[in-house]
Amino acid sequence: MKFCDLTQFYSPLSGGVKRYVHEKIAYIQSETEHEHVLVVPGPKTECVTSERSRIYFIHSPLISRASHYRALVNLRAIEQILEREKPDLIESGDPYQVAWKAIASGEALRIPVVGFYHSHFPEAYVRSAVKFLGQTAGEAMMDFTRRYVRNLYNSFQATLVPSARLGSVLSEWGVENVRTVNLGVNTTVFSPSPDDTGETRAELELPTARRLLLYVGRLAKEKNTRLLFHAFAKLTENAPDDFHLLVIGDGPERSELEDLQARCPNVTWMRYCTDSSDLARYYRAADLFVHPGTQETFGLVALESQACGTPVVGIRGSYMDRIILHDQESWAEEDTPESLARTIETACSRNLPRLGARASRLAGERLSWPRVFECLFAIYQDVSLNYKKQR
């Protein structure tokens, strides 16, 4: 069979969706006889071919100089690629114009199309508008967004979600045929070995007793990074020599991070880390991975951190419970800097190596990419068979 992934959430500086599709390509090439086609935005229009894989880059305008994300607006080019390739199944990882084009092309070419609900964007963007628009206007906007989500995702043959809890929310909104798919992790790259923590900490010039906190991801409102920066400032007020924050990522809230660096010397910022092996080194060196987001649905970085033996702390109420492989006793009860700062202090008093070791073992047992993709491709087969029966 030939499978096609179509998304505009794709940056050369990495990101969860990019890692997901490239791990899928690697699995197809090493474990199956299938073909794969990936259609994404890029700085120029070109096709990169490797064995049974083709990546189509469509020239698209840059919308973020920090993260290098682009808006895929040339919908005719998408249509032409799909007409030429004629895949057996299309997966859309986008809730906007690209998704509607995937659905329309699928109907025209008689190809089943599934949607992957990577980000719970109504909560991330619309809920926050309530405080500016007022309760009545905000709720009206939320109702409109629910209808949009329902109409879009009911146009797919199936909607894939990385969390059963999130799937329940979509079902309550009227989205049908929701299928839960686990996230995976490359346990060869992201593992507790080798023991290079001392070398990495020396590179960062950290005193032996200082706790290293790590954040990996975009610096953006929907990631709640401003709250993380405020929480770290409070930590250093109470204990200026006890913690160090390493941030790997860039985005619209970089100015808040620069302000934090100006006030707190114990902050290191790396705008990007494109090498997975280097990223794994930083995961291993950290005492604790801090995940401040409350609307995260994908959360691959949290899974990678645990696979490397580093536990995760965050704020209760997110959709990430399924991929947190150790207890969440220390997680923050409130979405405030004070609560997150207290949570980090409490978590650091626990036996973090023991928590991390358990999480790493479970990641290897349950969530290796081959195991995850076996389940995903079973869903693909089921969707394809049902689609043919309906025709």
Question: PLM features: what roles do these ranges have?
Answer:
Residues 326-338, 345-351:
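Conserved acidic donor-binding segment of nucleotide-sugar-dependent glycosyltransferases
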Residues 353-381:
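A charged, aromatic-enriched C-terminal amphipathic alpha-helix characteristic of glycosyltransferases
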Residues 165, 184:
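Carbohydrate-associated surface elements
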Residues 1-51, 56-57, 370, 374, ...:
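N-terminal subdomain of nucleotide-sugar transferases
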Residues 153, 281-286:
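Short alpha-helical donor nucleotide-sugar binding micro-motif in glycosyltransferases
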Residues 311-314:
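Short hydrophobic beta-strand element within catalytic cores of glycosyltransferases
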Residues 255-273, 277:
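Nucleotide-activated donor-binding/catalytic signature segment of Leloir-type glycosyltransferases, i.e.
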Residues 294:
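Aromatic "clamp/platform" in nucleotide-sugar-dependent glycosyltransferases that forms part
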